């Protein structure tokens, strides 16, 4: 999986995982013997909690002070769980970004400790899975170092009055354009309506309300 693995030692894309802002790592419940991903929280929990997640923003209703968006997650695993994988092991993953997770049996596995990558069943080039280590977790990785995103579902969330947007999507060297307030942020979203995607957009929430949006340049 050279094309997926090359350049992985670089920095992680800023559009990032769904994660509770102050949480300890816990894995999802699953069948006995199946390695499960880290629990990223449910859509229900996101309505009241403090999270950051990759998102596709559809619209901002400035009168109602609400944002409609689709939340995207990706699979990440505890390092010790991935380190223990071997031929015959079974793990749960959203293969190719499928909405439903499925159990995959490891038929072949290559571990590269130098660059922190693990290629399972030939990696993404052969319909398998590539993982990349970052700290104490491994996450799925596809071309251009992105995670393999899968859709978690749509949410309509309140927008904090003091919401901020930091937008450096214009080009690779763009200085971030800072915008604040529901009306101004809503205007910025509607002026570039189809270009808020999980690959460039990270949404931060506080107690269930959108507090900050980060959009980066992507090639």
Residues of each region from the PLM?
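Gram-positive cell-envelope targeting signals
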Residues: 1-23
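Solvent-exposed hydroxyl-ligand-binding patches built from regularly spaced Ser/Thr
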Residues: 18-219
């Amino acid at each position: 999986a050279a094309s997926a693995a090359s350049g992985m030692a670089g920095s992680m894309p800023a559009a990032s995982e769904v994660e509770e802002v102050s949480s300890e790592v816990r894995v999802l419940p699953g069948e006995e013997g199946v390695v499960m991903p880290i629990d990223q929280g449910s859509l229900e929990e996101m309505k009241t909690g403090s999270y950051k997640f990759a998102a596709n923003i559809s619209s901002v209703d400035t009168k109602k002070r609400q944002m409609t968006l689709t939340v995207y997650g990706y699979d990440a695993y505890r390092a010790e769980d991935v380190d223990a994988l071997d031929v015959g092991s079974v793990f749960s993953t959203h293969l190719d970004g499928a909405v439903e997770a499925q159990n995959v049996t490891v038929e072949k596995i290559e571990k590269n400790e130098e660059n922190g990558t693990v290629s399972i069943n030939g990696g993404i080039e052969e319909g398998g899975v590539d993982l990349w280590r970052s700290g104490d977790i491994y996450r799925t990785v596809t071309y251009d170092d992105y995670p393999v995103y899968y859709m978690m579902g749509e949410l309509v969330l309140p927008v904090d009055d003091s919401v901020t947007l930091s937008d450096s999507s214009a080009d690779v060297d763009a200085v971030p354009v800072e915008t604040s307030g529901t009306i101004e942020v809503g205007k910025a979203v509607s002026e570039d309506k189809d270009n808020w995607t999980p690959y460039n957009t990270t949404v931060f929430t506080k107690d269930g309300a959108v507090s900050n949006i980060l959009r980066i340049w992507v090639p």
